[in-house]
Regions:
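Alpha-helical transmembrane segments in eukaryotic/viral proteins
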Residues: 8-16, 21-39
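Short beta-strand elements that form the blades of beta-propeller/WD-repeat-like
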Residues: 61, 71, 112-113, 127-133, ...
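Beta-strand-rich domains and repeat architectures in extracellular enzymes and scaffolds
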Residues: 100-126, 131-133
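Repeated scaffold domains used in trafficking and secretory/extracellular systems
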Residues: 110-119, 170-182, 220-230, 271-279, ...
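Structural motif
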Residues: 135-156, 197-203, 246-253, 296-303, ...
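Short loop/turn segments immediately following beta-strands, especially the blade-tip
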Residues: 258, 320, 376-381
Length: 470
């Protein structure tokens, strides 16, 4: 084959391959156009997806045209449904661990806030841990003196449940040294109390924006629950105290809708004392178990109806649940009057289960150490001492502190009842330990259909820290 023939042959083969390649592309395009419509598609694929970028949720509308994606960012639709929360409480046979933040252990080498008064509240899609920071970090010089309750540096912040109160994931909620927070199904409402003791102000936030205020009406440390408020069918309820901690004070229940106060009522409770109520929804009413800081070692009970009418008294059970307290055997109980003469006290909680009651208390009678929850038969309505269940959460060789209640809404659990849950604060540092600071972590438990073994989910931080040795 001469050179000219070789050139002609190679050229013919190349041209054939080019023609074949073009034919294959034409066949591919023809099949794509003919086949896709038969599958009910017009050649484009529209899809709306939700993507999370750190703590920001962005909704994207993605239009696919063959091999090309067109992405449009669209505004996140606002949930327009309020939570109902009129369901009864689920019956709990025991309480299983839900979360533990280990904030102080992590804080020895991590950027974790010095906190007190942590509590949990839930929306239809998540539960969050709220806490009052001291404007300082664990193991830092600014943590000195944080045993003090009220200062201009204290703020209410929150993280997703189970996270430590760290600077990277915490969300600012309000300036506050006393607080409450709850979700109505649409947005979070938070209430932060701050300012001087004689002229404190409570600022109501809704969806992160200040919407209303409550000024101190008695001029003596206006304060609120330090646990979740309660929303029922779009209306949210909470309790506030103004007045002495060791004598008769003044108490009010408030109701708000979308962050605007629409009602309040004075709670008449002569001879009784109400502080730091732990409240939850149950069958369309708000049931609260509170702290008597004046005389009673039994806990005040407040039941609030939607029209702000109320019933107030004491937890009937024949066992005391405040600290300090006397011997169980010497306590008789009362549904109407404070019993015992110990004074002081600690925030606590209880759950009504029909006529029975689950009530939490420290194991120690004299100090904030250990924690147990007891079920007392007929303890909501009678001076019963019949203890039918007991579960240890923190053993008596470890510190506890405040405790409080919240519920898991049916939107989260898909049940037809509200799951009762509680948290236990575990205070470390001053005044019981040799440190320059005071902070806490928490364990969270939720009601289940099974009995749960005793154990100690204590704080576990090894003290003192480096800052305490300087």
């Amino acid at each position: 084959m001469n050179p000219n023939q070789k050139i002609i042959t190679i050229g013919s083969l190349s041209l054939s391959l080019v023609v074949l390649n073009i034919l294959l592309h034409i066949i591919s395009i023809t099949i794509t156009v003919l086949v896709i419509p038969k599958n009910g598609n017009t050649g484009s694929c529209n899809e709306t997806v939700i993507r999370e970028y750190n703590e920001t949720v962005r909704i994207e509308k993605i239009t696919q045209w063959y091999n090309t994606n067109i992405i449009e960012y669209i505004e996140k639709p606002e949930n327009d449904r309020f939570m109902n929360n009129t369901e009864p409480l689920c019956d709990a046979k025991g309480f299983a661990p839900f979360s533990k933040d280990n904030g102080i252990r992590i804080g020895s080498k991590g950027h974790v806030f010095v906190i007190r008064e942590p509590f949990v509240s839930c929306s239809p899609t998540e539960c969050r841990t709220f806490f009052l920071t001291q404007g300082s970090l664990v193991n830092d010089k600014h943590s000195n003196g944080t045993v003090k309750d009220r200062s201009p540096y204290r703020t209410l912040m929150s993280v997703e449940i189970g996270q430590s109160p760290n600077v990277y994931q915490a969300r600012f909620e309000a300036v506050a040294w006393s607080a409450t927070a709850c979700h109505d199904g649409r947005k979070w409402m938070t209430i932060g109390v701050t300012g001087p003791d004689t002229k404190a102000v409570a600022v109501v936030h809704y969806g992160g924006v200040p919407t209303d205020v409550i000024n101190s009406w008695a001029g003596d440390i206006l304060r609120t629950q330090e646990s979740s408020c309660t929303c029922i069918q779009g209306e949210c309820y909470w309790v506030m105290t103004d007045g002495p901690a060791n004598r008769q004070a003044q108490y009010r229940a408030f109701k708000a809708r979308q962050g605007r106060i629409i009602g309040q009522t004075e709670i008449s409770f002569n001879g009784g004392h109400i502080e730091e109520c732990s409240c939850y929804p149950n069958e369309g009413k708000v049931e609260c178990v509170c702290r008597d800081n004046w005389t009673g070692t039994n806990r005040p009970v407040l039941v609030i109806s939607s029209d702000l009418s109320y019933r107030v008294g004491y937890l009937c059970a024949g066992l005391p649940s405040d600290t300090p307290r006397g011997e169980d055997g010497q306590f008789t109980g009362s549904c109407t009057n404070p019993m015992g003469n110990q004074g002081y006290g600690v925030k606590g909680f209880g759950f009504r289960q029909g006529n029975d009651v689950w009530m939490g208390r420290t194991i120690s009678r004299t100090s904030r150490s250990g924690f147990e929850i007891l079920k007392i038969r007929n303890g909501w309505v009678q001076n019963s001492k019949e203890q039918i269940k007991r579960q240890v959460v923190v053993d008596n060789s470890n510190w506890s502190g405040y405790s409080g209640s919240f519920t898991l809404p049916v939107e989260l659990t898909r049940k037809n009842c509200l799951v009762p849950c509680f948290w236990v604060e575990m205070i470390r540092g001053r005044p019981e330990e040799k440190t320059i600071w005071t902070s806490s972590s928490s364990i969270v438990m939720c009601g289940v259909d099974h009995e749960i073994a005793d154990w100690s989910w204590h704080d576990g931080a090894i003290l003192p820290f480096d800052i305490d040795k300087m």
